[in-house]
Regions:
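Active-site phosphate-binding strand-loop segment of PLP-dependent enzymes
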Residues: 143-208
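Conserved core segment of the aminotransferase class I/II
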Residues: 213-290, 297-298, 376-377, 382
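N-terminal small-domain helix-loop-helix segment of the aminotransferase-like
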Residues: 7-96, 274-277, 379-380, 385
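A short helix->loop->beta-strand "cap" motif at the edges of active sites that frequently abuts
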Residues: 113, 134, 187-191, 196, ...
């Protein structure tokens, strides 16, 4: 059978099968803000949408509604450090960050090419690589250095068919942020696709610097959107921002975005008001997440079999469990104990036993779930003796 994932096994894995059989469990994997009480103020959304209905007229633009691009440029002008973005030529509005990734894969690669991506990452990259018939080469993150990128691995993995480097900063799920220039990227000269969707959720650092500000001389496509920043995954809007060295790709990217025109006009028209009036919500959401992370880390600090590093940013914790059992067995036993977490191998990491926990989960479910996690882990590790 030809086509996408034609030969793949898409049946449910043992963890999903067990989860479907259990009803009384607390889900500590949830990343949906609308299911965790983080709802962007409806009065602001109503205000943002009202002018569209009064003057409704579809005027498609392959780069996105100019007012939306102006709002995005204004956002980057307020980042630390600030980025100067030309809304006329540097911004492309998309239906989502995932769509922006797909556009950039189409822009930068041909079948048989390869891109470098972090070894620990979510499955999106693998699916995109399959879609575009390219090779995904995984570069490791160094756990001894706070999951920092190993520059020598980037150099080792690249060859004449390497077309781009994917960087997720803040990284999902380790929370690592690239805070300084990586000289080998300058030497390679490859375009960088930088995913910054967790940029407004710092924890162990005061702010998340835009990579395009840290490395201004390398072609960088910066991706973000309203799904994480404003807890609006249902309104479907993202963007790609080009720094000056990346402008050479703008004309071809315009053709690609014009081919899809995925971003809907209503959400684009709402964006200036969302960004202008949404700052208080962003701060409130950040404070809730920071409090949740601190609560969970304090609770886990008393558990001898657990090691957890404070994330630079984001809302995930990447937890190491000191056990002889494999991750799948641990997660299945935790499900039986009434709590659901993801194993590290779901994110492509197969060293030791790591669990991924979302601190977006609302109280009291978060504290109750963490208590079940702690109790379950103590029983699991006790069985190792």
């Amino acid at each position: 059978m030809p086509g996408f994932l034609a030969n793949a096994d898409l049946s449910a894995n043992p963890i999903e099968l067990r989860r479907q059989q259990i009803t009384d469990y607390i889900d500590l994997t949830s990343s949906n803000p609308t299911r965790n009480g983080l709802l962007f103020p409806p009065d602001i959304l109503a205000e943002a949408a009202a002018p569209y209905w009064q003057t409704r007229r579809y005027q498609p633009n392959p780069r996105g509604l100019f007012a939306a691009r102006q709002a995005i440029a204004g956002y980057y002008a307020q980042r630390t450090p600030a980025l100067t973005i030309d809304p006329a030529q540097d911004i492309f509005v998309t239906a989502s960050t995932s769509e922006a990734y797909a556009l950039l894969f189409a822009l930068l690669t041909n079948p048989g090419d390869n891109v470098l991506a972090p070894q620990i990452s979510y499955p999106l990259f693998e699916y995109l690589a399959e879609m575009f018939r390219i090779e995904l080469r995984s570069y490791p993150l160094d756990p001894q250095r706070g999951w920092r990128i190993d520059p020598w691995q980037l150099a080792r993995l690249s060859d004449e068919r390497t077309r781009a480097v994917l960087i997720v900063s803040p990284h999902n799920p380790t929370g690592m942020v690239v805070k300084q220039a990586i000289p080998v990227l300058q030497w390679l000269g490859l375009p960088i696709i930088c995913d910054e969707v967790f940029a407004e959720m710092p924890f162990a650092i005061p702010h998340v610097p835009p990579l395009a500000a840290v490395m201004p001389n390398v072609p960088i496509f910066t991706l973000n959107g309203i799904s994480k920043m404003y807890a609006l995954p249902d309104l479907k809007l993202g963007w790609a921002v080009l720094n000056p060295p990346a402008r050479q790709y703008a004309d071809r990217l315009e053709v690609l975005n014009d081919t899809l025109l995925g971003a809907n006009a209503l959400t684009q028209s709402m964006l200036p008001t969302i960004m202008h009036r949404g700052h208080n919500f962003v701060v409130q959401q950040r404070q809730i997440i920071q409090k949740n992370i601190a609560t969970v880390m304090n609770r886990l600090a008393s558990v001898d079999c657990v090691r957890v590093r404070a994330p630079d940013a984001g809302y995930y914790l990447f937890i190491e469990v000191l056990t002889t059992q494999d991750e799948e067995a641990v997660v299945l036993q935790l499900l039986d104990a009434g709590v659901f977490v993801h194993p590290g191998f779901f994110f492509g990491f197969d060293q030791g036993c790591f669990l991924v926990l979302s601190c977006l989960v609302a109280e009291p479910q978060l504290s109750q779930g963490v208590q079940r996690l702690v109790d379950g882990l103590r029983l699991i590790v006790a069985a190792d003796v």
